A protein has these predicted regions:
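Conserved N-terminal/central alpha/beta ligand/cofactor-binding core
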Residues: 1-49, 53, 109
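Sparse, context-dependent recognition of short Cys/His-centered cofactor- or disulfide-binding micro-motifs
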Residues: 18, 28-30, 36-39, 65, ...
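Flavin (FAD/FMN)-binding glycine-rich loop and adjacent Rossmann-like elements that form
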Residues: 47-48, 60, 67-79, 83-260
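A short, glycine/Asx- and small/polar-enriched loop/turn
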Residues: 55-62
């Protein structure tokens, strides 16, 4: 990809500068993840199991209650990591968390369903903002590892990501939008004359998430000035993607200068 100018990293239609994503095949990822987990002597994978509540000892989380096909059980641990994506265990344990859409009406934020399409030209423009004819408000295509195949982020609904009712409604609405988006691209977007739907995501993705209130918040000035805290454990090569609670895309783009 890096050495070919017909692919995505050199697509000048993108809103991001010099954007390069780590493209991977989801089926290869599943196999690689299984191999890593099963080859480690101290890891015991347990699939088809959901954590339903934390086990508390005072104000410490010492494990989780789980439910699966065998019923309800408990797993004790020295360390518990909340990887639910919604801070579910953190909130259930009483930790202070705030919604990323706390200031939006009814705590509503964008919810979307990704889908994958084939039959698309390799030289099609992948981004255009302010497209009012589609729910997302923009054309937004991402290439996969296969020629003529793209992952598409163009559905949009609003809701509270912690509400089962909102997530159900948004999932159904976003899936309903997909055939209309496919047809719009076929008729109106260069390179999509032969587009067809391959599949869609099993779950909707809410942008209205909950985050833990830490010892020190990351402020706007920190982000704009590229402040790196002393206790940093990792650096990310991608931007902070801010989605409007009312429409698609970012509200604000700020680029660091070379060397920052």
């Amino acid at each position: 990809l890096i050495h070919s100018n017909k692919y995505y990293p050199f697509d000048r239609s993108r809103c991001e500068k010099d954007l390069q994503l780590t493209i991977f095949d989801p089926e290869c990822f599943k196999l690689a993840a299984d191999e890593i987990l099963t080859s480690h002597p101290n890891i015991q994978p347990i699939l088809y199991t959901r954590a339903v509540a934390p086990i508390m000892s005072g104000n410490r989380v010492t494990g989780v209650y789980v439910e699966n096909r065998e019923g309800r059980g408990a797993i004790l641990a020295k360390r518990v990591i909340d990887a639910t994506g919604m801070s579910f265990l953190l909130r259930a344990a009483g930790a202070e968390c705030v919604s990323t859409c706390a200031n939006a009406p009814h705590r509503q934020g964008p919810i979307l369903v990704f889908f994958r399409a084939g039959g698309i030209s390799e030289v099609t423009p992948t981004y255009r903002p302010n497209v009012t004819d589609v729910p997302y408000g923009a054309i937004n295509l991402f290439p996969t590892m296969r020629d003529h195949e793209y992952r598409i982020e163009m559905t949009r609904a609003l809701g509270d990501g912690s509400s089962v009712e909102d997530m159900t409604r948004a999932s159904i609405e976003c899936r309903r939008q997909i055939p209309e988006i496919i047809e719009y691209l076929r008729k109106n977007w260069y390179g999509c004359e032969n587009i067809y739907l391959i599949d869609s995501g099993n779950e909707a993705l809410p942008m209205s998430l909950y985050k833990l209130v830490g010892r020190r918040p990351v402020c706007v000035n920190d982000m704009l000035n590229g402040v790196v805290p002393e206790d940093t454990i990792a650096l990310c090569g991608y931007g902070i993607d801010v989605h409007s609670a009312e429409k698609g895309g970012q509200n604000y783009l700020h680029y660091l200068e070379l060397g920052q």
